[in-house]
Amino acid sequence: MDLLYGLVWLLTVLLEGISGQGVYAPPTVRIVHSGLACNIEEERYSERVYTIREGETLELTCLVTGHPRPQIRWTKTAGSASDRFQDSSVFNETLRITNIQRHQGGRYYCKAENGLGSPAIKSIRVDVYYLDDPVVTVHQSIGEAKEQFYYERTVFLRCVANSNPPVRYSWRRGQEVLLQGSDKGVEIYEPFFTQGETKILKLKNLRPQDYANYSCIASVRNVCNIPDKMVSFRLSNKTASPSIKLLVDDPIVVNPGEAITLVCVTTGGEPAPSLTWVRSFGTLPEKTVLNGGTLTIPAITSDDAGTYSCIANNNVGNPAKKSTNIIVRALKKGRFWITPDPYHKDDNIQIGREVKISCQVEAVPSEELTFSWFKNGRPLRSSERMVITQTDPDVSPGTTNLDIIDLKFTDFGTYTCVASLKGGGISDISIDVNISSSTVPPNLTVPQEKSPLVTREGDTIELQCQVTGKPKPIILWSRADKEVAMPDGSMQMESYDGTLRIVNVSREMSGMYRCQTSQYNGFNVKPREALVQLIVQYPPAVEPAFLEIRQGQDRSVTMSCRVLRAYPIRVLTYEWRLGNKLLRTGQFDSQEYTEYAVKSLSNENYGVYNCSIINEAGAGRCSFLVTGKAYAPEFYYDTYNPVWQNRHRVYSYSLQWTQMNPDAVDRIVAYRLGIRQAGQQRWWEQEIKINGNIQKGELITYNLTELIKPEAYEVRLTPLTKFGEGDSTIRVIKYSAPVNPHLREFHCGFEDGNICLFTQDDTDNFDWTKQSTATRNTKYTPNTGPNADRSGSKEGFYMYIETSRPRLEGEKARLLSPVFSIAPKNPYGPTNTAYCFSFFYHMYGQHIGVLNVYLRLKGQTTIENPLWSSSGNKGQRWNEAHVNIYPITSFQLIFEGIRGPGIEGDIAIDDVSIAEGECAKQDLATKNSVDGAVGILVHIWLFPIIVLISILSPRR
């Protein structure tokens, strides 16, 4: 039995946890669009596809519910063309794209999340409709080309237009509409493997009447009011494809800075071809001047070199194309190397042995490259001992060699190779190489104090390799321990003095670096290498870098600072401070963290705590903000009908909120409410007293009155505790004229001034009346009507019919709901969406008549379908009704009260709701009376347990 009572207790705690969420709810989302979509009769798109004309403005709104207020994010997946939504997302309820283009079509997703449950995601597909100008191209049958291009030949006219939706084509000859089969000499067809993309008009064995003006009309059936577009082509016996010629050489070799002009002329073609210039790679230079078929580049550079093509097109046959290559002279990158006698293993230059000097440059064009050799300023010619050669361009382009056979003392001196281009206009490159007894191969060493090299993160460091020898070669630096890039992003860095300078050193740069000699500007021998070790010290990396801790007075708090990484890791010390006050110091042993605790918080214990963990390179810091400030309130945005109007120019607003983590700090004693009119500077403030503790998820309501229509107001709410002010939160409230609520969910308790947009029927006999028990006439008829609204409140409002005189039996009062709009049915999709319609009704009195509910469907003809009916005395209680409805178009609900035979026949309704989805089965099957809603959830869950206890208790 004790186990059973324990089970009851556990279940009660669980249910309290569930109900403790209060109004907190995971997000729901729905997408609506402003304006009307372009409808296609035969397509019948569902509401999840939105069609829009190119160039117009797309506006999609994401309607969300959920508490706390969900964060909204719009994203997009590509449609027919890849588009990444400008590589960004939109964090706003409304997505607005002005001048929408075709590539912006696709599926748009709205994602809402507030940390409760799973994110809510809805999508809508956007189709962008457009129609480009059609283009007609003309071709003759293959293999029949002769001088008279179209004389007694078969001709094909192809019409193409880009569009969405698919285009429909029609042909005309003059004013005559051409149809398949209307003329034996004409055939109209679509090519294989196309889907309405083109339409071909085939003229078989041209006849005299076929020489005429042809028109192709492209149409998308006026979808989105896109007009038809037409293109015409005049076919004659002179119609011919284009031909051109270039009035320039190929290739064209020029010097940098010169102006160049390319001329392209047409030699044939009817109609007259259009001429365009293109470049084989990339676009034309920005400075290019185009004038018809003439292209001018004022001051050419090496970057402008390449192949330029002139293209002529008149939509007859294939376009004509002629090309020329522009070469811009250039000489660059002069370098040399010395190769000792290859038949000896010695790398040194010695008397009596062979030595070879090589020079290399990059030349454009390579055919114009020439080399000249000099010794001590005097020209050298090839001889038996001084052999001058040029390396095969396929092996080593732009390279010349001077072989000195049997080196003699008299051969010592300065040798110069000069590279030049035959065309001139480019400065020569001169390279000097000294051959003497002091010319020796290189050697690399690392100074003793330069490896290992210790530095700190963020410093500037120089890695050094000393190079000896003559001449001194270029030094190449690279990473020796791993295949990673050097600081400049390349795999190797060049140095002319053996020094590698690194700015802003990072910890990732620690490791071994290799310096090695290059063959250029030195000896062509096996590279010399040396290694330099770099050690980068960095201060400790710690977590958390910053943490806010909110805690009430007289409570304890513990702060912990953890070391993630540090170098050097040894001799780590720490110190705790509150502001400038030193609290504690110490040294790490084997642990990776340090803690500081405050057993009982008071005013002097609040503030910023800093924990510094220190090594040779510096300090890492954890910061803790310990505060007693209350968290910000969370405004509730899902209030049903928050705006109501009591006077002509004045409106009121029901402001609701919850308190985030109310138990985190001391009890909230009041809220400071600030309000100011939009655009004004001054805040009007007042305090709202709070009695007792606020529960998590508890909804707090405060009515803002005397607001001026149609002004918007900024509202600021700040919680107050004995610590002081907490975090503020701000929202804007706006007056909006009553509109039809979104059908996702509708609830009306008739509490506001506009009674949720319900209206009286002008064709009935009398009206429904808004009333509460507290405001009803003191001369009311006894023994009929409710004593409170359906929640049990004497101040709550409901709608009722007064059946006292002069009302007569059978007279009707009809109350009309707002018009609810739904999306048109998709004939190829699922069935219509179901909605659960529910309301409370009160029928007490001996003369009760009838209460009917009708579903009025909007269309070309208005139809009223009986939905629900009840009659007779139901007792002094509120009853609930649930009905599933399946509207196929916009609809209204009509409450019709019919007066009974006497004055004790008042009928009332309250809490009308419409929710998407079918009603629960138990709701449809139950019509129980309801006196209040408090505790129902717990009582229902506990009922089986209580029954079980009552059965088992006698057995004890």
Swiss-Prot record:
Glycans are attached at residues 92, 213, 237, 434, 443, 504, 610, 703. GO terms for biological process: spinal cord motor neuron differentiation. This is MAM domain-containing glycosylphosphatidylinositol anchor protein 2. CDD domains: Ig, MAM. Detected in Leydig cells, syncytiotrophoblast, duodenal villi epithelial cells and neutrophils from kidney and cutaneous squamous cell carcinoma (at protein level). The gene is MDGA2. Residues 27-127, 134-232, 242-328, 340-436, 442-533, 540-627 form the Ig-like domain. May be involved in cell-cell interactions. Interacts (through the Ig-like domains) with NLGN2. Residues 746-921 form the MAM domain. Disulfide bonds join 62-110, 159-216, 264-310, 359-417, 465-515, 561-611. It is found in: Cell membrane. The keyword Electron transport does not apply. SMART domains: IG, IGc2, MAM. Its main location: membrane. InterPro entries: Cell_Adh-Cytoskel_Orgn, ConA-like_dom_sf, FN3_dom, FN3_sf, Ig-like_dom, Ig-like_dom_sf, Ig-like_fold, Ig_I-set. It comes from Homo sapiens (Human). Residues 638-739 form the Fibronectin type-III domain. It is a lipid-anchor; GPI-anchor. Residues 1-25 form the signal peptide. One of its GO terms (cellular component) is plasma membrane.
